[in-house]
Amino acid sequence: MSLSLPDIVGLFETKGHAQYDGEPVTQLEHALQSAHLAEQEGADSALIAASLLHDLGHLLHDFGGTPTQQGLDDLHQYRCLPFLRALFGPATLEPIRLHVDAKRFLCAREPGYLEALSRDSQRSLQLQGGVFDSAQASAFEALPYAKDAVRLRRWDDTAKCADAKTPDLAHYVRHLEAALKPTAIAA
């Protein structure tokens, strides 16, 4: 059930040109913009890999169209984890797993954040459990990798610009390779 690096590249090449639902970019453009923003901010390879892969779960289901418009939470932040676990460690996987909760956290703690979300992101927020209450926000904040998940979330929110210039997918494969677990390298 795991993917190899060539499988991941192939998935982006075959399914990445699908529209990122409710946004003016494709899935691949969104992934590349997220990784580019992480790289520009000096993130390490594990977090750049997380930024590239955080929405891979959207490419691994067959719901079709825009799941949020169908009232569905596609659980993309969890859907991709079994496919990536053999390759990457927690420094990559945990920010992916937590990036949806990071949105819920920021809505609770940062004035104006909720209102600044795109329409589809606001719709998905409700399907994903809504804004954290104070106790949930505090519990999230205490988690390992919560800060990285918040950084990823901010790049995710920003990486929706039509016609933005980024390096191509091949450029980011080196970050994927650098983020591999030692056991994945040996395999």
Region annotations inferred by a language model:
Residues 11-15, 83, 95, 155, ...:
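Residues that form generic nucleotide/phosphate-binding pockets
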Residues 7, 33, 79:
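Short Gly/charged-rich anion-binding patches and loops
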Residues 1-11:
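Extended, non-globular alpha-helical segments
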Residues 9-32, 57-61, 67:
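Active-site flanking loop/helix segments enriched in acidic
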Residues 37-154:
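Divalent metal-dependent catalytic cores for phosphoryl transfer on phosphate-bearing substrates
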Residues 6, 25, 122-187:
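Metal-dependent nucleotide-binding catalytic modules
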